[in-house]
């Protein structure tokens, strides 16, 4: 998984790809938390990065749900 993926890059993905990325990030977060609990985690910063990635994916999905942004290849927002 890419470290620090930008919201612009996420907006280029389809809904299915976003959901898959969300699943992967949640799985990685679970594994990182498990490593932290057992004292095996070397990079504490990665926890924060993964949580932010999850939030970014949720944000892009919510924007599409509300019609604030369209999927890849579509126009963003509405014209007035």
From Swiss-Prot:
List, alphabetically, the PROSITE patterns matched: RIBOSOMAL_L29 (PS00579)
> Would the keyword Ribosomal protein turn up in this protein's UniProt record?
yes
**Keyword Ribosomal protein included in the entry's annotation:** yes
Alphabetically sorted, this entry's keywords are:
Ribonucleoprotein, Ribosomal protein
A single GO CC term for this protein reads: cytosolic large ribosomal subunit
Residues spanning the membrane? none
Any one biological process term the GO annotation gives: translation
Offer an example of a GO molecular function term for this protein: structural constituent of ribosome
Query: Which InterPro entries would you find in this protein's record?
Result: Ribosomal_protein_uL29, Ribosomal_uL29, Ribosomal_uL29_CS, Ribosomal_uL29_sf
Going by the entry's taxonomy, the superkingdom of the source organism is recorded as Bacteria
Q: Which family does it belong to?
A: Belongs to the universal ribosomal protein uL29 family.
By what name is this protein known?
Answer: Large ribosomal subunit protein uL29
Protein species of origin: Mycobacterium leprae (strain TN)
């Amino acid at each position: 998984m890419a470290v620090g993926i930008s919201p612009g890059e996420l907006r280029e993905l389809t809904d299915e790809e976003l959901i898959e990325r969300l699943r992967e990030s949640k799985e990685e977060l679970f594994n990182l938390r498990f490593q932290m609990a057992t004292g095996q985690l070397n990079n504490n910063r990665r926890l924060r990065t993964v949580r932010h990635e999850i939030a970014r994916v949720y944000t892009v999905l919510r924007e599409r749900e509300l019609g604030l942004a369209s999927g890849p290849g579509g126009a963003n927002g509405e014209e007035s």
